[in-house]
């Protein structure tokens, strides 16, 4: 029943916007763009990812949404027709959530859309965008993002806010990440930042 309500809500939202599906966009920050202090202010516990994405899709420009929050990155994946309006709305959400000002937040963010957004997430899931290249945790974290994003409502969390576009995109990058790890040697060496630190200390 919960899954049916979720589907009806999404269909109603798309109907109100002319029934057209938007295209993907990612807004976020990482160890490459932001300090630990800024990343910590944006961090969201995994148990609250769906609550955050539910708030995001309340914005009129956003059709679908998913959140990925780790120690080294915070990324919001959305689907929208008007990427300018979507960027404005996601930025508003990030300001409210973090309590950071425009000047504190804006310089740390990156924005990618359409094919660039997909390629970015492929690099993330494969471990190519990690602090330690090929580290093993990130694929599990992207898988968790996908699982939450497509989940039905439960006693523990709201339903995910991914629809056709984000659902397919997240599933595809998880499959690609698995393929990269099984068919290449990228996973050799340190599997995480902590293990890399241990190796350097020995």
Predicted regions mapped to residue ranges:
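N-terminal mitochondrial targeting presequence
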Residues: 1-18
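A glycine-rich (often HGG/GG-containing) alpha/beta subdomain
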Residues: 15-130
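Glycine/serine-rich phosphate-binding loop and adjoining beta1-alpha1 elements at the start
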Residues: 104-202
């Amino acid at each position: 029943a919960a899954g049916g309500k979720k589907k009806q809500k999404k269909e109603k939202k798309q109907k109100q916007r002319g029934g057209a599906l938007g295209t993907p966009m990612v807004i976020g920050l990482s160890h490459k763009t932001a300090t630990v202090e800024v990343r910590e202010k944006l961090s969201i516990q995994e148990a609250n990812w769906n609550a955050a994405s539910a708030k995001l899709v309340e914005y009129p420009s956003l059709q679908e949404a998913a959140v990925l929050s780790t120690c080294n990155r915070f990324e919001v994946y959305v689907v929208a027709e008007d990427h300018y309006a979507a960027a404005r709305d996601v930025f508003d959400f990030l300001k409210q959530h973090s309590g950071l000002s425009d000047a504190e937040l804006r310089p740390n963010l990156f924005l990618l859309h359409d094919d660039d957004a997909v390629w970015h997430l492929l690099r993330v899931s494969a471990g190519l965008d990690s602090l330690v290249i090929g580290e093993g945790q990130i694929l599990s974290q992207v898988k968790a993002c996908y699982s939450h994003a497509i989940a039905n409502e439960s006693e523990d969390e709201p339903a995910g806010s991914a629809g056709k576009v984000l659902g397919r995109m997240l599933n595809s990058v998880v499959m690609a990440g698995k393929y990269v790890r099984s068919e290449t040697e990228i996973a050799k060496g340190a599997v995480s930042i902590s293990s890399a630190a241990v190796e350097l200390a020995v």
